[in-house]
Every structure is written in C-alpha cells, then in structure tokens.
A protein has these predicted regions:
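Short glycine-aspartate micro-motif
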Residues: 5-7, 104-108, 188-192, 224, ...
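Active-site-proximal alpha-helical scaffold in enzymes
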Residues: 80-93, 144-147, 152-155, 160-195, ...
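Glycine-/small-residue-rich "gating" segment that lines the acyl/pantetheine channel
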Residues: 128-135, 176, 180, 184, ...
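Condensing-enzyme catalytic core mediating Claisen C-C bond formation in acyl metabolism
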Residues: 4-8, 31, 35-36, 219-299, ...
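Short polar catalytic/cofactor-binding loops
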Residues: 10-17
Length: 314
C-alpha cells in the first residue's frame, strides 16, 4: 500500500532572511536582500550586485562546534546545515543524540558545488608545497555530498543519505526523490532541500558568460526583473532551503503540524534535442513534465491555482 506524504518542517537561509520568521517578514514586506558588493567591483565583474545570507559567527556556533568551525570555509555547507536543522526542529523531531541511528530517517540534500573557497585555499597550499597542512576536514568540505554527510552526522540519520545535483532543478528534485522513497515505504521521514556556495569563485563563470545583469550596479534591488521586457540577466545569489517530508500516518501519530501534502511530481529531461539545449528547456519536455506531474497527483489543470515559475530574469 502506497503511503501518503506530508510536509512537517521548513527551514531557510536566504539573502533577505535567515530563519522562517525573518524570511517571511522579508517576503511580505518586499525586502529583496540583493546588494552591491565592493569585492565584485574590485574584481571588475560586470555584475557587481548579488545576494548572500548574513550568517554571523554567533549564529554559526549554534549549529557547529568551535572545533568544527576551525579552518571551515564552505558556505554552502554552512547554509545547508542551518536550514536543515531548522527544518528538523520545526517539524518537532528530536535533536537528542542517540546510540542507535534513526533507521527510518534520512536526507536527500542537493548541492551544485561544495567548498569552492576551500578548494581555492587548498590549491594555493598545494602549489606552495604545503599539502600536508590542508587539515582533516578539507575532503568533507569539498566533496559534493559534504552537506548530506554533515546533516546525517548531526541528526544521526540511518536511512538514505544522498546529495543530488541537477543544476536549477536540484531542490525540486530532492523533494520528489524524498517523496518517492517515503511513498514506497522505504523511509518514514526525509530531510529534503538544496544549498549553494557563495562568492566570486562561484559566480565568476556566469559573469563571464554575460548572463548576469550589468545594468543595475547602482540600484541592486531592481536588478532581478523576471518576465520583464527590460530584464538584462540574473542576479547571482546563494543560500539554502529545507523541508521535512514525512509519512502522514507517522506524522499524525506524533501529533505533528502538517503544512501540506505532497500529491505527486515528475522528473524528465529534454535531452538537449529539438529546441532544447544545455541551458534552454525543450518545450515538449516541459509540457510532458507538467502533464505527468498532474497525472501522478490525480489532479487536473483546473485544480492548479498557484504556479511557482523558474524565473531567472535571463
């Protein structure tokens, strides 16, 4: 028998708000979080505006030990751990350290890159013949699955622990993968989400491709203009988002607050064929994905009243 899947926890680390309350306030009051960065101007980037979450050392120490933060230089993992743990707590799930792993709990937490700044730091050391000084945490900070490894260790997760990576669809894909695993009865709760590193070494390639806006360096908050005729490119930014997906029966049994039910979803690819390319979607694939998502959810187009589009302002 297929299980019903619900969302019981949320966490967010965004340029316009770290934590649900701050983020919700920013969204309701039109606060974008996009600002001008002197570092990007110094490096002569065409686009000198960006979004970066404001995470203080004081806040970081609420999620990491001082030892863990020694030689730590991976913003994507920082953002992802904060969002993930916040979502877990928001779901009312235990943070108490147990001897046994949580065999029914796992994480599928996506990332596009991991520890780019740590890579840069390490490259300089290696080139200076100081490879032995890299430190014992360099690998976990720079491997793509570092975020899921950190979360699994902090939460004692014993079910599937995976990092997916599919460019702009990474976060949505993690939710669908988590949904499928719970629906099939292979897990009772999965922490799903995605995260992204910040800084010029992540954003530089996009700036070189000339896909970032260059017309709004003097007016950062007007830079991102999706669906506008005056759109001149996207604004680079970083952060993380997380959701706890849970077997509805288990959630109800423990009296959890339920935000929503996940009815279904679909994943496909345009194969870079027809009108599709590496960056441009294949229109036929988009149609098929939407149609199959509605079919798997048991709804019709008339039932859809909100569309959260992938609006990059390119």
């Amino acid at each position: 028998m297929e299980k019903r899947v619900v969302i019981t926890g949320l966490g967010v680390v965004a340029p316009n708000g770290v934590g649900l309350d701050a983020f919700q306030y920013a969204i309701k009051n039109g606060i974008s979080g996009i600002r001008h960065f002197e570092e990007l101007e110094r490096l002569k980037f065409s686009c000198q505006i960006a979004g970066m979450p404001n995470v203080s050392m004081e806040l970081a120490l609420q999620y990491f030990t001082e030892l863990e933060l020694k030689n730590f230089n991976a913003t994507g993992i920082l953002y992802g751990v904060i969002a993930g743990i916040d979502a877990w707590k928001d779901a009312g799930l235990s943070m108490e350290i147990q001897e046994e792993p949580d065999w029914d709990g796992g994480t599928i937490f996506g990332a596009g890159t991991s520890g780019v700044e740590k890579f840069r730091e390490s490259i300089y050391k290696i080139d200076d013949f100081k490879g032995r000084n890299l430190g014992s945490t360099t690998v976990i900070q720079t491997m793509n699955s570092g975020i899921s490894a950190y979360l699994a260790g902090k939460l004692g997760l014993g079910n599937q622990v995976t990092t997916n990576s599919s460019a702009c669809t990474t976060g949505t894909e993690s939710i669908i993968m988590a949904y499928d695993r719970i629906k099939s009865g292979q897990a009772k709760r999965i922490l799903a989400g995605s995260t992204s590193d910040s800084g010029p070494y992540v954003w530089g390639g996009f700036d070189a491709m000339r896909v970032c806006t260059f017309r709004h360096n003097d007016s950062p908050v007007t830079g991102s203009r999706p669906m506008s005729q005056s759109a001149s490119g996207f604004v680079p930014a970083s952060g993380a988002g997380a959701l706890v997906l849970e077997d509805m029966e288990a959630a109800l049994a423990r009296g959890a607050r339920i935000y929503a039910e996940v009815l279904g979803g679909d994943l496909n690819s345009g194969g870079q064929r027809g009108l599709g390319t590496l960056t441009a979607p294949n229109p036929l694939a988009v149609q098929k994905c939407i149609q199959n998502a509605m079919k798997s959810s048991g709804i019709t187009a008339q039932d859809v009243d909100v569309i959260n589009g992938h609006l990059t302002a390119t």
